[in-house]
């Protein structure tokens, strides 16, 4: 498996051999991908000054426009991002990016939270920061949603309490039958779990900011189907690639740092 260079042309993605690893700047690489060709995007971009990316920075607005162009109608992107504290104030870069996505035509389908089980860089003047935003952004209405039914109901086995009603268009109500509460319900939009640092306590993931495999897999399962094309424009150490291999998705990833791509290739062997 080779790391392919920007000079390669990526048209007609349905006929390619996957996974595809692309070396170069995301804004340049995405311009070589055809319109309306990607089913799902998940990524955690370098934000503010929190990540050492070998001195590189990225042009958010150009990349956002290219993402809108290449994502299929009904496609979804999960944009995992946080904010740094600059001169005593949070940057709010995450919200500025979400607003820009909406301005160029996306829908902000959901604002989810990734709550970590641990924290780093504790502050003496504010509570420990243990979450990142996960903006679920769609091009039109999402065409795919496979909800994860793994939240344990504390009232499982009981008959639903009270009398449920459905309001009709004319304002009247229709009574609904009582039901037995199932053991598991749909997950909430705050996802709590181990960070990749905890997952890989005894491993060496050669990247400054990986997100955990379970997080990538759960989003891929939720917003795409087997055989779909999944893109990570800031793939880093290749966690999304590993998830796609395990879940039978067609992966495309790019990164500006060659060492990250080489390490990602090793992870999926």
Indicate where each model-derived feature is located.
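Core catalytic lobe of class I
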Residues: 1-263
